Amino acid sequence: MWIDPNVYTGRPADKRIPKEERCYDLLDSLGISFTRVDHEHADTIEACQEIEKLLGCEICKNLFLTNRQMTEVWLLLMPGEKPFKTKLLSKQIGSARLSFASPEQMLQYLDITPGSVSVLGLMNDKEKKVRLLIDRDLSGQEAIGMHPCINTSSLRIRTADVLEKLLPAMAHEPTFVGLPWNQDET
């Protein structure tokens, strides 16, 4: 996979697709500084490992989930290497059964395609239908890595800026959850 070895500060000088540009516009308007790495499509956590080394932070796992009836949707942010077990999360949020939302739902709610899901997509959730869940282990990290709504760039943003500036600006209050590192924990 091609990765530009340069780490850039701020938005790119060249033109990008509109949804990526909107991410940079939002971050700039909030005074949130970030570093950026450009690369080929990186749509799995495994593909992001070399990018993480350049950014100096972990790119979090972003899971877009729905209930069985497809009447509620959640965006879960968690450490990339942490295993995910739906049963444990379902119990914490009081939902009978969770599954991965469809690509159509990702587009409908976040204007994002699979492999590009990120907390920045919440800026496109104008009706505030998506409930944000954040694993508590992320809140202790200095910075969080994420895509700017497209998986050909990755950003490093201070966790405090995400929690204190970005989420309030997008009017999304997170619910913090505790997911175990060990699959056997309940």
Where are these regions (language model features)?
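Extended, low-hydrophobicity, polar/charged segments
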Residues: 1-186
